[in-house]
Amino acid sequence: AVSLHYTLKYPQEYGIESAPAVYGTVVTDEQAVKAGVENMEKALITFEKNKLSVENQITYDVLQSYLDSAERSAEYLWYDEPLGTVSGVQTQLPVVLSEYRFYEKEDADTYLDLMRSTGNYFDEVIAFERGKSEKGLFMSEKLADAVIEQCQAFLDMGNGNYLYSTFVERMRESGKFTEEEMGEYTKKNAQVIEEVVCPAYERLM
């Protein structure tokens, strides 16, 4: 849902009617990854490359390169690190959420559904990190301390957290909400932050 929203303003114009409001999944099954790559390759070769436009031939090559890379790296899934101090989940998720534009009222509903899935997503990350630890691949103590500090900094923002203020700003910018609706959505947003997002950060620590 996040990537789609940032890529297409109106996905329905491209025949995409709906997408699940989720961040994605933390994948650890090597065989599942390889099977997924194989299925995508089968779909890709149904297109005759020499009959595509130059632009689409480039897209074809990019997709093929991506699939080749995904297949080669499938056996190294446990070496991934979703909690990096610069581009980790704990630092990037609030930024991505705060920049999620509301073109229609439905976008705010999707956004709130996405926020509600934060707990499940973080639980997947936690399970992944435990798996890394069991395999002797856990991050260094210094990095772990830095991640904990970043999570604490997010929690310490309290009511000053920009996920509160930017939510209201985005509703105003869209011009799609009445004052009454903005009040209702603002309450829902605050509730999700307090009951789902913040507890997820606490568990991550």
Predicted regions and their residues:
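N-terminal maturation segment of proteins
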Residues: 1-205
